């Protein structure tokens, strides 16, 4: 599977290279060249638990990573979730169901993606024998989830900008009080938009990226 930039000005990449690169050099986002048709697989997929479903789905896009390796990465992504089903479906009454997405380490639904992304980054570090630095700006939950996805992970460092006094006390503690040497939570005097602007200016510097 190849991944193309939304701006169309950079060569396509495989899954692993797209993950390691992040933003495309032309400033676009990487999207898969095509989407698989899951229609015929829906009954089988519906019977899988969350890790098996995640590994099955990911294998359709991460075609440059062996299936056994993908399954191991997915299995390592969710032990910190506090419910054995990871995303339990609760029935409130007949015909009314609620999917619980708050059992991750930061209580945010973004833990589902960012715990897995941390494992994928760790895999890239081991395979490439190169360090990965992650830069981001947040208004709260994304930054905390990203930090906890990379918490203490060898070969990685994460730098998160957030507006001082404009995130919840819980989110600030989740970002600033981890004690992990590879985590750098940086409060700025300004708004979330100011944090994003500063991040874009940093990423535009070729000496940085």
Whereabouts are the PLM-identified features?
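PLP-dependent amino-acid enzyme catalytic core
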Residues: 1-209
